[in-house]
Structures are given as C-alpha cells and as structure tokens.
A protein has these predicted regions:
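Short coil/turn segments at secondary-structure boundaries
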Residues: 36-42
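Extended polybasic, low-complexity segments that bind anionic RNA or targeting/receptor surfaces
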Residues: 1-35, 80-199
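Glycine/serine-rich anion-binding loops at beta->alpha junctions
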Residues: 42-79
Length: 199
C-alpha cells in the first residue's frame, strides 16, 4: 500500500446522472463485438441461373430464378451481410468525462487502492505477492501499470479475476466491472495527467 493523493478533478467528480456512463459502456461493448452472422442473397446462392419456365403462356406467376427469396432454397432478403459495423462513436472528451465519473464512483465506494510499483520478473508469484499485499484476493480486480511489459503480462496472465491495463487503455467498462482497482504510483500519475480537464 502507498500513500498517494487522489486528484479531486479526476476522482471526485460529481455524477449528475448515469447516461454518459451507459453510453461509454455500450460503446466499448459495441466496438468489441465480432460479426459472424452471414446469409446469402439470391445472387450468392449457387444455381438458379436458368429461368424456371417461360415468361408467358403457362398461367403461372413469372419468375426469373429458382433462387428467388420467396422460394424454398432461395436467397435471404435483408439478412446479415457479415460486414455490419456496430461501433458507436463517442467523442474523446465524452469518453474522458465518463471515465472520470466512473473513477469518482469507484473512489466513493472505496474500491481504489494505490501501491508503490509493480516490478516483475515474469513470475506469477510477483503478481500474487502484490495482490496479497493489497488485501484484495477474492475480488474482480484491474491492475493499472504505467507500461505493460512482457514480464508483467506473463506474471498476471495466469491469475483469475485480474486484468492488466495501462492508463490510456482504461475504459468505463473496466472500471464498472471491477470490484477493486489497483493503481501503481506511476500509473496513477499517468492517469491523472491523461484525464485532466484542461488538455
């Protein structure tokens, strides 16, 4: 544990309503969404190149292809194309404001802990020692470090309920989904610098 002052401009912001938080949360999830669904249109379904019957004289309705969407085995009308873009745009200023609000709520709930630093040799025991020293062993945690080195990634990758994040990649999703947020001192300084109002 370390003694560190949390800047009120970042960790004590008034949250009038949660609408912006919700927008930022949904924006993160939408950007993470993978598009897998894909259906074939009448032009993509194999076959159907020949006209089923002549245009006139049969008494039946006219059709140009057996892959017509209203036929069995035909294409799909207005189905998913596989190239949908679900991202929801949010301005940088709005994102930063939302993160400040989320951190303020976390601070108010006593979820923020500051440690001196996280020096790792790449061993899991380094991360375990840090977690035990913070007293947050059985909770969903995010650990903020100023730089994600390979050693730090190796040290934390085997631990359940722990996510390693660098300050500029911090999101409302990370904060709201965590029961505890652990800052190293350098990461705290970098976060405050990044989220300051006057940029």
């Amino acid at each position: 544990m370390a003694n560190a002052k949390l800047d009120d401009a970042v960790f004590a912001v008034e949250v009038a309503n949660h609408q912006l938080l919700r927008l930022a949360y949904d924006s993160y999830l939408a950007a993470s969404r993978q598009v897998g669904a894909k259906t074939k249109t009448r032009g993509e379904v194999r076959g159907g190149g020949r006209k089923p019957w002549r245009q006139k004289g049969t008494g039946r309705a006219r059709f140009g292809s057996s892959r017509n969407p209203i036929w069995r085995g035909g294409g799909v009308t207005f189905g998913p194309s596989g190239i949908e873009n679900y991202t929801k745009r949010l301005s940088k200023a709005s994102k930063r404001t939302a993160i400040r609000q989320a951190l303020s709520l976390a601070n108010k709930s006593g979820e923020i802990t500051v440690v001196d630093d996280f020096k790792s040799t790449g061993k899991t025991k380094d991360a375990v020692k840090l977690i035990q020293s913070s007293g947050l062993t059985d909770r969903r945690r995010i650990l903020l470090v100023d730089n994600k080195t390979t050693e730090k990634i190796y040290a934390t990758s085997n631990l359940a309920n722990l996510e390693l994040v660098s300050p500029t990649y911090l999101s409302v999703y990370h904060i709201l989904n965590a029961d505890a947020i652990i800052f190293t001192k350098p990461a705290l300084e970098a976060t405050i610098e990044w989220l300051k109002e006057d940029k």
